[in-house]
Amino acid sequence: VAAKKRPLSSMTPTLVLKDGKPTLVTGSPGGARIITTVLQTVVNTIDFGMNPAEAASTPRIHHQWLPDELRVEKGLSPDTLAILQKQGYKVSVKPTMGRTQTIQLRDDGLYGYSDPRNPDGQTLGY
């Protein structure tokens, strides 16, 4: 932090629309892993048809410039880890990464999920 400097921020509050109407609202607190956490939640929901609980519960993957390592969350399959290492990635397994709060809006109601990685979190909608 210094005068005339902008703080680094990865804030990514996300609203996904379909035909102009909201279908998914999600976000994540934290730092550098916000963008990949939110992206993986959106991809899991839209592309893989997961509900918010399933989308949040899958193991996460993150890479940034420094440190030059691929961080993966515990629970990623050993086969996948072996493939990544064979491709030359320096893989670092972490117990947890990122947290989300997500609400999915469907025709039959609202489905919210508070990521269990944050035991104090709540997902609220009205």
What are these regions (language model features)?
Residues 75-126:
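Cofactor-centric catalytic regions
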